[in-house]
Amino acid sequence: MAEVFDVVVIGAGPAGYVCAIRAAQLGLKTACVENGSYEGGLGGTCLNWGCIPAKALLESAALAETLKSHGDEMGVRPVEVEYDMGAAVDRSRFISEKLTKGIGFLFKKNEVEHVVGTGRITAPGKVEVTPDEGDPQTLEAKNIVIATGAVMKSFPGFEIDGEKVIGSREALALRSPPERMVVVGAGYVGVEFADVFNAFGVEVTLVEALDSVVPLADAEIGKTLARSFKKRGMTIRTGTKVKSLDRDSSPMILTVETDKGEETIETDVVLMAVGRSPMTEGLGLDAVGVEMNGPWVKIDEWCASSVPGIYAIGDVAGEPMLAHKGSHEGIVAAEKIAGVAEHPMRYDNIPSVGYCHPEVATIGMTEEEAAEAGYEVKVGKYPLTAHGRALTAAHNEGFVKIVADAKYGEVL
């Protein structure tokens, strides 16, 4: 007879492992299914091949950039800054592995059963787990939580081959930086990688189809960041769409389209940073009648799907596709299942951060969104050029901006 769990979580990324641990803390018998061969296992993309190793490389980049740009004025005069991308990558991998082991420890401490394999819902309350080797097993669950995350997107003609066209995973393991790189997509992932490789001496061109870098942020942020990147020697191509790539030429020839027509860019590597797609294929959602919201699982404010006893959290449950949002959804879902939930999800006040240099952090409405929503907008702004700590750290580019409703004074 199959073992019966109160909760089976499919996926052990920031949403899944947090949900599993919280459910176990609330006294629920919990299992978490994760295929160890996918994205390194516990911790998912974020800990293994996303947020954490990227931030480690960004710290290396920040140190290199500070020495180059501000060393003399700060009284530190290295004869020459030498780059060792391999050492930076090794450090990032060590940090990821340490944190992944920490999740394993938390699973043991809280008595979460880690089931290694690929999970699929075969019927309400039943999850089939197929390991890389061996026979499948079936877990019976009173509640199932889908936390399978997302995978990198690409375009036809720009399929990731791991060498000439790479995604974020390959970029995080790149031990020898190329001479030239085109980063396609100037969202937070794109600008972070542009920052890293520029700091390590790569000639970086950042290509974005929309009219601004970090196009979902306040327009002023995009202008300030683009200006800073240009000062550091990066080429910024906004309002530019990629059309084709000649991989056989050396260097490769990337053809792009602007409002002035087609142009070409020479490059050694193309890094695709055009977003991620929720991973729902092979989960068996159609068979059990789970309703979808476009490519995502449709959920309510308690992270419940259209099928009783099935929940969805994290990237698979919709935007914003952010680790901390997924973690909070995991807590909400676990507490709802345990019958102790007090606060449903709110999606209007989730912070978003880009750890490039200068760093970008936003929460709430942009000035443009507030105006479009019909508010009488009032803006307060403070330049970091007047901020003591920013000046002492030589990080005084940028500003703090508050968008408010002029009528009632509400911060938007």
Question: What function would you assign to each model-found segment?
Answer:
Residues M1-Y17, Q25, D218-E220, K231, ...:
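Mid-to-C-terminal Rossmann-like scaffold of FAD/NAD(P)H-dependent oxidoreductases
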